[in-house]
From Swiss-Prot:
Protein name, UniProt field: 3-ketoacyl-CoA thiolase
SUPFAM superfamilies linked: Thiolase-like (SSF53901)
Subcellular location: Cytoplasm
Gene this protein is translated from: fadA
Residue numbers annotated as active site: C91, H343, C373
Pathway: Lipid metabolism; fatty acid beta-oxidation
Coiled coil: none
One annotated Gene Ontology cellular component of this protein: cytoplasm
Single GO term (MF): acetyl-CoA C-acyltransferase activity
BP GO annotations: fatty acid beta-oxidation; phenylacetate catabolic process
Presence of the UniProt keyword Metal-binding in the record: no
Naturally occurring in which organism (per UniProt): Shigella sonnei (strain Ss046)
Keyword terms, alphabetized: Acyltransferase, Cytoplasm, Fatty acid metabolism, Lipid degradation, Lipid metabolism, Transferase
């Protein structure tokens, strides 16, 4: 079976969804920009040699509809002979895109693929056009479709206090800002055109979503966002709304070496699981355990973790049940996470994987694990091994 390697991984800056940098930039343009950039950074691979493009996106309507993967590829002037498909596993869409490409390469059906994802939550809101079947209520609580209430449920089940959530959220912003200031994101962010507050066109090379002034004291003043009576989850301890895209160049190890391209990491294992929709945020626990089992590893073997921060109330139970509470500051989301950077749904899987690869190199660790929860009760995880 072919070994699957990541040759390169990049992303756009994360733009604020409400009146942010990309308010006049379409999702297809963000995607096409990264497709062009990946190919330009790796000229040894001719675009025509790509076997397929796998692109994650959740809200596949309006500018993100009608197979945005193909639309973006055409905008990027990728040869017409290269196919493209849009992948949707809700929050796990772009990680699923990676898994799909990896399996094609493992089986010998492909040698090179471009994977990634996008979500412009400012142009196409998360709830746009959603219409759940009323019959679902026979099997699933209505609140299971309300992500904030599923986070409240996890907080109550696992004893995650308001104070713990506020502290974790403040940490996310502090670490993301420190990473920005130190240049830790420079190897992954591709400068991207947008508009500043005055409407002037400029190149953005930083995440505008981060709030460096965030403190535990300020977060403590916010009202509960989803359960006004007894809730603990606030807007400040939830992932920010942002616009962005991320992309990775995935190849068989043999083809990469044949072209003289240096692999950055191997895909060691992949896993997807289902869980109770009422606690959808718990999905990373069984997904990570399954991915570790497939890799023949344990959590203690993993040098760094990237766990998508849908909510502080959601990620803390996952950290606890993976036995990592005492290692948060050594292993978990060392450059902050979605609470600070935002969670553009179709982008996040590739985004956290990209950040993880850079952290693995910076920390000089062999293994890294990226995982995320998925709305309606799923989890997805990938174990990477440095080459």
């Amino acid at each position: 079976m072919e070994q699957v390697v990541i040759v390169d991984a990049i992303r756009t800056p994360m733009g604020r969804s409400k009146g942010g940098a990309f308010r006049n930039v379409r999702a297809e343009d963000l995607s096409a920009h990264l497709m062009r950039s990946l190919l330009a950074r790796n000229p040894a691979l001719e675009a025509a040699a790509l076997d397929d493009i796998y692109w994650g996106c959740v809200q596949q309507t309006l500018e993100q509809g009608f197979n945005i993967a193909r639309n973006a590829a055409l905008l990027a002037e990728v040869p017409h002979s290269v196919p493209a498909v849009t992948v949707n596993r809700l929050c796990g869409s772009s990680m699923q895109a990676l898994h799909d490409a990896a399996r094609m390469i493992m089986t010998g059906d492909a040698q090179a693929g471009l994977v990634g994802g996008v979500e412009h939550m400012g142009h196409v809101p998360m709830s746009h056009g959603v219409d759940f079947h009323p019959g679902l209520s026979r099997n699933v609580a209505k609140a299971a479709g309300m992500m904030g209430l599923t986070a409240e449920m996890l907080a109550r089940m696992h004893g995650i206090s308001r104070e713990m959530q506020d502290a974790f959220a403040a940490r996310s912003h502090a670490r993301a800002w420190a990473a920005t200031q130190s240049g830790a994101f420079k190897n992954e962010i591709i400068p991207t055109g947008g508009h500043d507050a005055d409407g002037v066109l400029k190149q953005f090379n930083y995440d505008e979503v981060i709030r460096p002034e965030t403190t535990v004291e300020a977060l403590a003043t916010l009202r509960p966002a989803f359960d006004p009576v007894s809730g603990t989850v606030t807007a400040g301890t939830s992932s920010a709304l942002s616009d962005g895209a991320a992309a990775m160049l995935v190849m068989s190890e043999s083809r990469a070496r044949e072209l003289g391209l240096k692999p950055r990491a191997r895909v060691r294992s992949m896993a997807v699981v289902g869980c109770d929709p009422s606690i959808m945020g718990y999905g990373p626990v069984p997904a990570s355990k399954l991915a570790l089992k497939k890799a023949g590893l344990s959590a203690s073997d993993i040098g760094v973790f990237e766990m998508n921060e849908a909510f502080a109330a959601q990620i803390l139970p996952c950290i606890k049940d993976l036995g990592l509470m005492e290692q948060i500051d050594e292993k978990i989301n060392l450059n902050g996470g979605a609470i600070a950077l935002g969670h553009p749904l179709g982008c996040s899987g590739a985004r956290i994987s990209t950040t993880l690869l850079n952290l693995m190199e910076h920390k000089d660790v062999q293994f890294g694990l990226a995982t995320m929860c998925i709305g309606l009760g799923q989890g997805i995880a990938t174990v990477f091994e440095r080459v």
